[in-house]
Amino acid sequence: MAKKIDTVTVEVVRNLLMSIAEETYGIIVRSAYSTNMKERRDVCTAVIDPDGNSVAQVESLAALLGSMLSVVPNIYEKFGRENVHPGDMFIANDPYHGGGNHLPDIVIAAPAFVGDKLVGWIANIAHHSDIGGKVPGSTSGDADSLFQEGIRIPVIRIRERDQLIPSVLDLLLDNTRVPQEREGDLTAQMSAHLIGVQRIQEAYRRYGDDLEACMKELVAYSERRVRAVVATLPDGEYSYTDYVDGCGDKYPDPLPIRVKITVAGDSLTFDFTGTAQQIKAPINVPYPCTKAAVFFSVKALMGDDIPANEGINRAVNIIAPKGCIVNPTEPSPIGAQIDCCQRIPDAIFGALAPIFPDTAVTAGNGACTTTILAGEGAIGTDSVFIFHEVIAGGGGASRIFDGLSGVQVNMTNTSNMPIEATEMEFTKILARKYELKTDTGGEGEMRGGLGIERELEVLQDDVLYTGLGDRHKFHPWGLQGGGEGGVGAFYRVSAQDGSVTRMGHKTTSLPLKKGDVIRVITPGAGGYGDPKKRPAAKVLQDVVEGKVSLQAARDQYGVVITNEDGIHYAIDEQATSDLR
């Protein structure tokens, strides 16, 4: 019979485990080499119990949760629990064999022993700017096989009994275009584990076997909390279909992401039957990422105070037919899977909005708008530079608040890449514009968040540009009469003649010349409620702040605003009353 632990001790241990995850996260961010990790913070860390269940994870990227939830069970399956030793570290990146979400996401896990007793694990995952493959940045819009996307790392040891295995590190570094940066980032990940293991050992020495008992109770508590919320919902089936734009010229037609959610008592089932089949293009979503998307959606709707751990997964059932785009078969390409993965929460939120009126949000930018620029001339000894940025967009609105502008949504939660960091690290790139894009937030009583317009000029010839995005065709939807958010777009401005060319949403390795400018516009977000009910004073403030144009204020909100001197704005009360 499991030992009963008092709730105060469980809560203290929960916060202790969270502090361990947060401390190791901070170590990686502070010591990593690449801007991907130290600026964008494309990193996630977790504490895992001896049985392989996640019990505490830092609140960073929801997209990275799926990989860490499966890494320890995969280690046990391949090596056997009895063959895991103190001082070991395991590494992987292959989503089909216990690794990351796509090949650039490298997960490392380390066991914590006290004497001969395995008392827990520490795991982290981080996005590396290049791990080989057909294009710089290891992420393209046209790969038709996983083998084109970089080196595949099954679950293997990189350290054994406190000793680095040099041959494994050499193999990884020889398969990247930027080996110095890769070595620095991998060292940061491994160094964080040295502290993480130490902290778990200290926790065990303090709490003894009660530590594992608290871990089990935390998982059980999260499951109970989710089931308790589900039990209050009306039984029934709730369905929604959203769409991915397609994938380049090869797949121009929309791809449906269809979910049917069944509520029965305290049971919740997500059925993706009817979703598009897998394709020979890199937007297939590995099943661990689909699982993470459901995990995120459940937690977002049911309470941010529910501890994020394996208990949430235990409270739900997922049906994702093998061979569909959200559960592809090996070796389907998955490099740009995040654009499709983003649509899973959108579909779930759309389905459950009628029974979650207080927490439902409209569709946000729903993309992972990626810009990769690669050329000669990196800082340090590496022969090339690879600039990788994910640009934010609009956040969804709800019944009680406007959407946030210029933020990552759903599965992504990376930080802004400051202009100063960009130009300091990448001296051949000049930022020409970085601002919110007027009128991209959907109109509503609560306005959707705005997308961003970003312009980057290249200062040398022979730079390759890859641009990956979505919602360039399908607008982010609104709720309860709210309007759609703006779509995204990629443009090239030629240095030679100033001509502007719109590019596809999956542009791969486009050659640029010195002085060419890449213009990226990210999607906005849908609005919530009748825009004519938005207080005129709020519309005025939106106009003053450049979020809504004078024309949109009149046409969409029914608010007439004057600007006779070009400086001061005022509401024309009579004209507004007539329109409304």
Residue ranges of model-derived segments:
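Glycine/proline-enriched, intrinsically flexible loops and inter-domain linkers
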Residues: 1-86, 91-580
